Amino acid sequence: MHEFVTICIMAAALGMDAFSVALGMGMLKLSGKQIFRIGLTIGLFHVAMPLAGMAVGKWLSGHFDVIATYIGGGLLLVIGVQMALNAFSDHEAEGLKPAGWGLLLFAVGVSLDSFSAGLSFGILGTEMFVTVGMIGAMSMVMSWIGLIVGSHFQKFLGAYGELLGGLVLIGFGLKIMLPL
């Protein structure tokens, strides 16, 4: 029972991280179909990354944690800068979009922290399928909530909403890269 509570708390924490970042991404003008795909992709990556972390194991954790931090923060920073720069542009952004490779890069950036969580769970020997299922489901649902809430804010804020979303992602990227 204690292990299940630990898994639930970790899944909620990783889900809140996904919610926060999705809130910023939700400031883009997204369709319901895009919101569904983004949340599903983030959920799938929150299954794949802990699995990868569990598979890699303890020997790589000391080296990859630092690299994962900078990669994840850097990806969020790039997406945030691109959103902020294109907030008041008359044409559609040519940079990273929440589709195709842009969506994959976004999902990787959001889910890199779950790789480290997977390392921890692998070391502790937790039940793999329950763990990654809980993390994936929680992250997917929290992403959908963040995207929907962000899209409602965007309706009121217009182009300023996309700028705000970009600044949120920049802030999270910097927070990840430069922990205080």
Curated annotation (Swiss-Prot):
* Name of protein: Putative manganese efflux pump MntP
Q: Which family does it belong to?
A: Belongs to the MntP (TC 9.B.29) family.
> Which is an annotated GO molecular function term of this record?
manganese ion transmembrane transporter activity
> Function, please?
Probably functions as a manganese efflux pump.
Which top-rank group of organisms is this from? Bacteria
Origin organism of this chain? Shouchella clausii (strain KSM-K16)
InterPro entries, per the entry? Mntp/YtaF (IPR003810), Put_MntP (IPR022929)
Q: Where in the cell is it found?
A: Cell membrane
Any matching Pfam family: Mntp
Keyword annotations for this protein?
Cell membrane, Ion transport, Manganese, Membrane, Transmembrane, Transmembrane helix, Transport
Transmembrane region(s): 4-24, 40-60, 64-84, 103-123, 129-149, 156-176
Membrane disposition = Multi-pass membrane protein
Q: PANTHER family from the xrefs?
A: MANGANESE EFFLUX PUMP MNTP-RELATED
According to its record, what are the GO cellular component terms?
plasma membrane
